């Protein structure tokens, strides 16, 4: 008969003691479990509701699931919470039948013994009083005799034992903290903390009932040495089963208890017998011997087509394309395992360099490494932990290529290409017409092509290129609009209408601004910035080069004080619809009357970081440096001796002033003759 949480009376006494109705208030009995569910999957499901101590799916002698299992918790409240939520939540498409588990009926001797993971049981097994353990010396002060805590439901993000030492160091001296790992390098999901005194452990237990590590609630209990627990278990007699129905339930609970005991007592000092038992188990996710990882595989490749191709090197054990679990589609990679070392070495020896996934086949590439016209990239497989680190590194490289996390090597600032780009399907794309989207995409492709062809070109961090400007807009109006953009961006951030700049972007801006300055120059620049504006220059390109009057070409440039302000300006101005007031900002009354019919209002701006030539920028920087140095020099160093300059001026005047009056008269006669000849020539025409 099923028991539900509604008809279970919760005792007010210690939660670790047995309920009067024979129920274990810390354990759930779970039925209707699908046959393919593992212990780990069951544990993951219930850990969503509360921190669990242990979860086990009961199996028969053939290692097949019997369709039911047990889940134990550290606190009774967690059990009730998990019971209520598990009855309403589907697991692999099924609703599980969950009840409070019954405790087995044991002899009087065993009934007095409480769960080994509680403080009371730890004291009974070790056979020591509180005072004896607090003042323990000699044999009890050895590592095995030290009071130890086990922390279950540990988050995968916590990998440093020092973090645990800091947490539990608040309650007493921490001798050691360990976070065990499996043979494949994966974390076990629990940790051990050894403290100096058992009184420290009790204080820690009382204060860590609601402990969270990295946002995940954990369960803290006493840990007991495995050999002592084994001796204790041998001393306890087993009760015979009463009937067939109870037999299945009791056997399942016994298996559950044994599994729980083994899991809780595992630590670094585990005995050799346990190690031998563990070594017999087949390691999961183990790296296959003589296996390689293949990239640039066609998406339609199958095991049947890959195996014959790689059999050119020798005997193939398997050739499996990698399938994405979420989509069911091929990822374009594969694992291939060979049967012997020689074949494996032959495949690796002449393989093209990793990353050479080009569709263009070089002359030095052997035909064995070309599959359906693609050059295969082949590398030895890695253990899971190394592969994880490699994946993180490759992800960082991809982010750098996308401009999300630029590294120091990107000196051309190519990551800024994506700033201002509008992608189809985005909210900003809904504001633009199809023509505008086509123009933007053409502009992006043109910029990419220019940067590829000329390595001297780079993207400026402070200068913006603005397209689709209204024809009536001049330099003054553009500068006012750029200033407004920075102010409006800051206002929207303050009102939580827009995301602020990231910490990385602000650091990047500061680093770029003071890159070529010394400490004194930095201080002087900071004082200068307080007096100057955020916009250094704004220029609208006119049809007549060099003229300030005339018709605008519809694009211009704005240079900001630093990269931070440039980013703020770009993100606010991009796709901004220019208003009439913004256009007329820089015009006088006469000019306003002339351009009333050509305002071009409603145009949405296309804003990007401008492309610059590094040689021109370098030359300009040197000129500014020379001008700055020239201003700081004394006058006599720059112009020479004052006396000499005064003496030179009269000489120059003497040379240009005619000394003889006849020479002046002769010059006038010559001018008259030249003028007479010119008149005669014009008369003939």
UniProtKB/Swiss-Prot annotation:
Q: What is this protein called?
A: Nucleolar protein 4
Gene Ontology CC terms, in alphabetical order? nucleolus; nucleus
Where is the PTM Phosphoserine found along the chain? 247
Subcellular location, in the record's words?
Answer: Nucleus, Nucleolus
What is known about what this protein does? Answer: Required for 60S ribosomal subunit synthesis. Probably involved in the processing of 27S rRNA to produce mature 25S rRNA.
Record field: compositional bias (Basic and acidic residues) = 106-123, 231-242, 645-672
- Alphabetical list of InterPro entries matching this protein: Nop4_RRM1, Nop4_RRM2, Nop4_RRM4, Nop4p_RRM3, Nucleotide-bd_a/b_plait_sf, RBD_domain_sf, RRM_dom, RRM_MRD1_RNA_proc_ribogen
Instruction: Kindly indicate whether the keyword RNA-binding belongs to this entry.
Output: yes
The gene name reads NOP4
Q: Which residues carry this modification: Phosphothreonine?
A: 379
The biological processes this protein is annotated with in GO are:
maturation of LSU-rRNA from tricistronic rRNA transcript (SSU-rRNA, 5.8S rRNA, LSU-rRNA); ribosomal large subunit biogenesis
Feature: compositional bias, Acidic residues: 130-140, 243-268
Q: How does it assemble?
A: Interacts with NOP1.
């Amino acid at each position: 008969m099923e028991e539900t949480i509604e008809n279970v009376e919760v005792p007010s006494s210690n939660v670790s003691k047995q309920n009067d109705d024979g129920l274990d208030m810390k354990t759930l009995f779970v039925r209707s479990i699908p046959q393919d569910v593992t212990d780990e999957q069951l544990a993951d499901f219930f850990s969503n509701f509360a921190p669990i101590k242990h979860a086990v799916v009961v199996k028969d002698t053939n290692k097949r699931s019997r369709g039911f299992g047990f889940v134990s918790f550290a606190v009774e409240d967690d059990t009730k919470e998990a019971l209520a939520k598990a009855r309403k939540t589907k697991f692999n498409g099924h609703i599980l039948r969950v009840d409070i588990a019954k405790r087995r009926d044991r002899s009087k001797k065993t009934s007095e013994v409480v769960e080994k993971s509680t403080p009371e049981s730890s004291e009974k097994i070790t056979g020591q009083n509180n005072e004896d353990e607090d003042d323990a010396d000699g044999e009890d002060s050895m590592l095995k005799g030290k009071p130890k805590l086990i922390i279950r439901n540990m988050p995968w993000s916590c990998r440093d034992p020092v973090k645990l030492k800091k947490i539990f160091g608040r309650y007493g001296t921490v001798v050691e903290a360990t976070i065990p790992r499996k043979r494949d390098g994966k974390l076990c999901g629990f940790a051990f903390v050894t403290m100096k005194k058992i009184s420290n452990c009790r204080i820690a237990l009382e204060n860590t009932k609601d402990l969270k590590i990295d946002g995940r609630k954990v369960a803290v209990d006493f840990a007991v040495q495995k050999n002592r627990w084994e001796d204790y278990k041998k001393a306890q007699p087993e009760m015979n089963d009463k009937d067939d129905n109870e037999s299945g339930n009791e056997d399942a609970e016994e298996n559950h208890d044994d599994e729980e005991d083994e899991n809780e007592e595992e630590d670094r000092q585990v005995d050799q017998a346990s190690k031998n038992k563990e070594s017999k188990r087949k390691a999961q996710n183990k790296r296959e011997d003589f296996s390689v990882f293949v990239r640039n595989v066609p998406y339609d490749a199958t095991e049947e087509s890959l195996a014959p191709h790689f059999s050119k090197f020798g005997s193939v054990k398997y050739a499996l394309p990698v399938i994405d679990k979420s989509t069911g589609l091929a990822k374009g990679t594969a694992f291939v395992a060979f049967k012997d070392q020689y074949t494996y070495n032959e495949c690796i020896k002449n393989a093209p360099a990793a990353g050479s996934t080009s569709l263009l086949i070089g002359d030095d590439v052997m035909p064995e490494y070309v599959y359906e016209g693609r050059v295969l990239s082949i590398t030895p497989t890695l253990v899971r932990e190394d592969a994880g680190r490699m994946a993180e590194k490759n992800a960082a490289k991809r982010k750098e290529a996308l401009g999300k996390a630029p590294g120091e090597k990107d000196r051309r600032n190519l990551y800024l290409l994506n700033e201002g780009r509008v992608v189809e399907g985005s909210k900003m794309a809904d504001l633009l017409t199809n023509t505008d989207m086509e123009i933007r995409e053409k502009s992006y492709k043109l910029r990419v092509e220019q940067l590829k062809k000329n390595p001297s070109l780079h993207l400026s961090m402070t200068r913006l290129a603005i397209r689709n400007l209204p024809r009536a807009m001049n330099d003054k109006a553009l500068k006012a609009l750029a200033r407004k953009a920075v102010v409006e961006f800051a206002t929207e951030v303050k009102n939580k209408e827009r995301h602020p700049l990231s910490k990385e972007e602000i650091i990047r801006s500061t680093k770029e601004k003071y890159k070529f300055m010394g400490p004194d120059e930095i201080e002087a620049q900071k004082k200068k910035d307080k007096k100057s504006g955020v916009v250094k220059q704004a220029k609208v390109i006119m049809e007549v080069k060099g003229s300030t009057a005339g018709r605008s070409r519809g694009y211009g440039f704005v240079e900001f004080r630093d990269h931070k302000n440039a980013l703020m300006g770009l993100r606010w101005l991009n796709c901004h619809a220019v208003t009439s007031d913004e256009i007329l900002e820089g015009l006088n009354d006469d000019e306003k009357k002339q351009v009333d019919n050509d305002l071009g209002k409603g145009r949405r701006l296309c804003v990007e970081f401008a492309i610059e030539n590094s040689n021109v920028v370098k030359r300009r920087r040197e000129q500014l440096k020379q001008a700055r140095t020239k201003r700081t020099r004394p006058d006599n160093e720059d112009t020479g001796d004052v006396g000499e300059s005064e003496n030179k001026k009269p000489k120059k005047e003497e040379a240009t002033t005619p000394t003889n009056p006849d020479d002046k008269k002769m010059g006038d006669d010559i001018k008259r003759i030249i003028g007479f000849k010119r008149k005669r020539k014009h008369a003939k025409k």
